[in-house]
Design a protein with these regions (language model features):
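N-terminal low-structure segments adjacent to metalloprotease catalytic domains
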Residues: 1-91
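Beta/coil-rich, acidic/histidine-enriched accessory regions frequently appended to metallopeptidases
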Residues: 7, 280-301
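Short, compositionally biased low-complexity segments
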Residues: 86-105, 274-279
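Active-site-proximal structural scaffolding
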Residues: 122, 205-208, 250-254, 267, ...
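Short helix/loop segments within enzyme catalytic domains
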Residues: 218-239, 262-279
Length: 301
């Protein structure tokens, strides 16, 4: 039997306030950060262990075109999940058409919260993200995105992540049980990272992070934190969108540039093509600009 190498990542030395990507819309007094950038950097520096390209012709030709969903989770199922903090035991507390909500054993999530996650996922997050960033892969053959609710680091700090090293065996996004107030924004953001990584794992941060902020905005609208990101770049627009340095202005630049491309070059269909293009950075954007969607507006007008 083929054993796929898994690199779940390590958060033991991760400092969210320094290395984390702050989520849009979270309160200034209680910042909540994504650990995805840190985990992706670890994965890249390790040489992309276990890399799978689920939309490549070779991979698609190796699998049946029919989705059997034979390994789907059912409510009440128990299992073990690899996380960036080690393996945890989980129980499926809720399922929906496109998700299974797995809760770390010993953690208590109210049924009203679980119901809200499932309904918001199906009504808003899943359709919005897939419209702009493409359909999800199904490497684990369960036809579900695993929404894994675990204890990470208490209130604030790391709110969630997508671990690219785990993507070789399953489709999972992780949320800290102590940051559930921001769960929907976290899920919209991290699901974009999952979708983007499945098509173009080598993409530059300024495009991937811009798209992740775009996912949160398209799902839940504008707030003061989003305008703060945008204004940080607007007040110093000499900063290049392509020169990524992890500053607030960098996130604002990436977000606004992706929104500009969607507005000019064809909306969700255009962004889907950008995400699916394995060319990176400016080369992928040039490819899109030279062959935009029907009804696109010329850049510069």
């Amino acid at each position: 039997e083929l054993v796929t190498e898994i690199m779940s990542g390590d958060l033991s030395e991760f400092d969210p306030s320094i290395e984390g990507k702050r989520y849009l819309f979270t309160d200034e007094s209680e910042p909540v950060f994504s650990a995805t950038g840190h985990l992706k950097m670890e994965w890249r520096e390790a040489g992309y262990p276990g890399l799978v390209l689920p939309f490549s012709p070779g991979y698609l030709n190796s699998r049946s075109t029919a989705r059997s969903c034979e390994d789907a989770w059912s409510q009440g199922d128990e299992g073990n999940i690899s996380t960036a903090s080690g393996t945890v035991s989980v129980t499926v507390q809720k399922i929906s058409a496109n998700s299974a909500i797995l809760v770390e054993d010993g953690q208590i999530i109210p049924s009203t919260t679980l119901n809200d996650i499932a309904s918001t996922w199906e009504s808003t997050i899943y359709p919005t993200d897939t419209t702009y960033f493409g359909s999800p892969p199904d490497i684990d053959n369960n036809c579900q995105i695993e929404i894994v609710l675990i204890a990470i680091d208490g209130e604030g700090g790391t709110g969630g992540y997508f671990s690219p090293g785990i993507s070789s065996v399953r489709e999972s996004v992780f949320v800290d049980v102590d940051d559930m107030s921001w769960r929907n924004t976290i899920l919209a953001h991290e699901f974009e990272h999952l979708l983007h990584n499945s098509r173009d794992p080598y993409e530059y941060l300024w495009i991937d992070e811009g798209a992740a902020d775009m996912a949160a905005y398209l799902s839940f609208g504008v707030t003061s934190t989003l305008t703060g990101h945008a204004n940080a770049w607007s007040q110093d627009s000499s900063l290049s969108v392509r020169w990524w340095n992890g500053r607030i202005a960098d996130y604002g630049a990436g977000f606004m540039f992706l929104m500009y491309l969607a507005d000019k070059l064809g909306g969700g269909a255009a962004i889907q093509r950008l995400v699916a293009d394995t060319a990176t950075g400016g080369a992928a954007i040039e490819n899109l600009a030279q062959n935009p969607e029907t009804g696109a507006t010329a850049i510069g007008t």
